[in-house]
Each structure stands twice: as C-alpha cells, then as structure tokens.
Amino acid sequence: HSIIFHSPAIGLSGLTFLCFCILYGPTITYFPLLADILYKATPSHIGAVFTVASLGTAAIAMNLAWLGRKYSHRRLMLSATCCYVVAQTLMLVLPDAVSSLWWLTLPIFIGGVAQGLTFPLLNARMTTLAPTRNRAIVMAMNGTVLRLSQSLSPLFFGIGWSYIGWRGPYAMGIGVALVIGALVWRGYPVSSEKE
C-alpha cells in the first residue's frame, strides 16, 4: 500500500492514464470514424495513416537515450505535452481546410512523437519508485491503469462526439493535453533531471 499510494506513484499513474486516454480516445477510436465520414477512407488508407504514427514513435524512441542525456526528463515531458496539444489542434482544424486524408498524417505523426516521449519516460520513472523486489507491484499497477484508460477513454471522448460531432473528441483532447502539461509542470519529479 505504501508503494501504490505513494504520491509520486499516484501522479505518474495519473499521467499514464491521461496519455493513454489521448491514444485510445481521439486517435485509435475516433480517427477511423472521422476518416470514414469526412474522407470515405478505406481500412487500408486508415492503416497507412496509423503507420505514420508508429514511425513518429520509432523515430523518437531510437533517439531517446541521446535526448535524455541532453535534456531533463521534465523538459522532454513538457515537449511531449506541446506535441499532444499541436496534434489535437491540427486534428480539430485541418479537416475543414484540406480535402485529402493524407494531410492528417501530420498530426498523427506528431502524436506518435508525443507517445514516443511520454510512454518510455513514464515507464522508466515508475520502475524507480520501488525496490527491485517490489517492482512487479508497481508495474502491475501501471498495467492496470493502462487497461482502465483503454476501457474508459472511448466512452469519455464519445461524450464530445455525441454533442458536437467529430470535433468533440479533439477539443476534449486539447483539454486533456493541457491537464497533462499542468501536472508535469507542477508535479513531475525534479530528481528525474538528466538521469
């Protein structure tokens, strides 16, 4: 209990939950619906766009060790927050401005970059919260948070879709990204600086 309900563990779990909310809500659940409704996109086209997100994640993941030596983890998390905000904002405005689905690869790529920063950094930080013998407890809790986010985020962002259509999940995504930024700014452990 002292490990699970430790303040840093709760904060990091909250960040993990919110980051996965953006992934499983606006991106994985509602982007295919948007692509179908606005662009009549085929499943293969939607899959190709998602591949771009994977490329963004991979590009950052391959350079994360170098970035971690050059910049503090807190700064990287704030940069990821900016990426989330930019990606969600572009998803909100681009469909009204462009006629091709392929323009949406830009925000999807930027979102992939954000994922490539946040998920490894949060996982790495979580593993430092407990001695080796108790690390499985922390990681199991982290996995539970992930699954909870996976289950609840489509329902949560669906409220926005229900009230204002396809723009709803992305407007809510901007709000969630700003909450992530506020949590990182005020509470991300200073001890993670240039680890």
What are these regions (language model features)?
Residues A35-D36, L67-G68, I159-G165:
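Interfacial helix-cap and linker-helix signal at transmembrane-aqueous boundaries
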Residues C83-A97:
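C-terminal ends and interior cores of transmembrane alpha-helices
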Residues I159-A177:
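A membrane-interface helix-boundary motif in multi-pass transporters
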